[in-house]
């Protein structure tokens, strides 16, 4: 949940759990300030509680059975939809980059690149669908190896503050492509 009143207006973010944008349990938030300009309020983010995390994990467990049974082609199609959304509209990309610049105090060039690369990571992962579609990969002599792929369950991703979109892009699309939630 992201509410903006303009490109540099303060934003309010919440949780997105089980397909629904919602505030943190109890409605608690914390203020985000621009580290490069400590008096500039960037916005407010949800101060999630244990019950919010539990709700997210329950939702992910609930979605796992259906998602893990989808084909690699179906997963790739969804990842490409996400990439298209992330890359759509130069104005949206620029606005996201400005927001991350203000939130992290990073140069705009870095945040712009990070926003664009997130979509690329989803698209690159989706491109592997055909290679992953085989249930087993057997290597012949001199190797006695069989690789099988099975979704494991819920993936919890914690990303650092300094490159949040880059780290997310290096973990989330792959977990989803593997059939995890």
Residue ranges and their predicted role:
Residues 1-37:
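Hydrophobic face of amphipathic alpha-helices that form TPR/SEL1-like repeat modules
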Residues 19, 75, 122, 155, ...:
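Residue-level signature of catalytic and energy-coupling elements of molecular machines
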Residues 24, 110, 164-167:
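Secondary-structure boundary/capping motif
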Residues 31-32, 49-53, 165:
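A short local loop/turn or secondary-structure capping micro-motif enriched for an aromatic residue
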Residues 34, 47, 149:
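Conserved strand-loop elements at the edges of beta-sheets that form or border functional pockets
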Residues 38-133:
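Glycine-rich loop-to-alpha-helix module at the N-terminal edge of alpha/beta enzyme cores
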Residues 135-181:
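Conserved small-residue-rich beta-alpha loop and adjacent elements
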